[in-house]
């Protein structure tokens, strides 16, 4: 937890909505990623586990998210990541989506139009990189 943050830094904080996708109740990895992102200055909106694509997209809109992070531990729930990415595109949100979890691969992430993160440290690096790329557009 951040105990002190200047007003200027708080205003510049980027927002990331994170969730474990629908059907998946495994959230330890997501919780670690959320903690790491928070410690690196992101405002994390953690929706928890077993979250429907619609709820994730609604939260991204409501919180004016800069990024969305999705987690899945089971191959049977990875398809819900695709549902979320598709809904983000359908709604025209223009928000990058990061995906990760034990069963998620770079090839899968690419196939659904998302950005792959291998672990919590990589998630922080990727989030910063995606934010910087958007800033430079």
List each model region and its residues.
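Acidic/polar, glycine-rich intrinsically disordered N-terminal extensions of enzymes
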Residues: 20-22, 114-115
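A charged, well-structured terminal subsegment
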Residues: 126-137
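Glycine/charge-rich, flexible interdomain linkers and switch-proximal surface loops
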Residues: 7-20
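Short, small-residue-biased leader/transition segments that mark boundaries at the very start
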Residues: 2-3
């Amino acid at each position: 937890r951040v105990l002190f943050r200047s007003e200027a830094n708080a205003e510049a904080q980027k927002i990331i909505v994170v969730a474990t996708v629908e059907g998946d109740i495994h959230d330890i990895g997501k919780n670690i990623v959320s903690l790491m992102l928070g410690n690196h200055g992101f405002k994390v909106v953690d929706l928890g586990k077993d979250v429907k694509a619609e709820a994730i997209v609604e939260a991204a809109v409501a919180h004016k998210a800069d990024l969305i992070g999705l987690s899945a531990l089971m191959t049977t729930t990875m398809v819900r990541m695709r549902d979320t990415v598709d809904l983000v595109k359908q709604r025209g949100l223009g928000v990058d989506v990061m995906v990760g979890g034990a069963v998620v691969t770079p090839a899968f992430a690419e196939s659904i139009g998302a950005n792959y993160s291998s672990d919590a440290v990589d998630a922080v690096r990727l989030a910063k990189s995606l934010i910087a790329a958007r800033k430079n557009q």
